[in-house]
């Protein structure tokens, strides 16, 4: 049973999506991107003003080069994150964002959307122990080590989580923890692959918990879901990892939100994304009620959701690029 607040959040998310879909239907080809943008406003507790958001996206387009990735629909993702975090100062912050991106490229990051998303994580981060340059360097070192550990599972869509792991200057130690989690999860029946790879990185961000405890929590959540619905796809493994940030996540509530979204005509064919959105909405409820403030996990969860949504966006981008390549042959 959904609480009144969660029901209202879900309705608000649906209304933001409906407005975006109506007004951007010829500009954004993937409904999933609009879904992620809509949920980001709810998770971050920001009011949505379409005109301000659209003006910002237009400003971005007019202030980048002709061949920039941001000339495409990706500018809307960037606009949403800048709008959420900086609102009326977003346009002034845009140049700082571009400076951060260019600095990352100079260090060796690729010129692609995932570096833009990583620059946003750096720009909106709240780390008190690591400056941006240190985190850039550590993030790149973490990414390079990821490739050494799992060459075929690692691509630039892993860069946002690599940057997050590098936040406190202990990224390589965190990556060792991630590798332990990966092997333990595989030994406990989880399917090896890119999604389990993402899970291990999300779990490793929880520095105060041992790998065995984190893997046990993942397994319990997985079992709770499979008791209620059919076997969970590996696509959803990263969402299970997000739920481990809570001591006792209520899986039934997450599934209730998912069911409510599944019943919406607009989301009828988006069942996999609906579960991902439901997890974000459920976590935002705990964040909003300050249940995590004292544990210091509030900012961590907020940022990990952002990184996870960046990874989801990355997956959508990758599938689009693959289809375009196929079409061109």
Swiss-Prot record:
Put simply, this protein is called: Uncharacterized protein YeaA
What species is given as this protein's source? Answer: Bacillus subtilis (strain 168)
Checking Pfam families in the record gives: DUF4003
- Domain of life per record: Bacteria
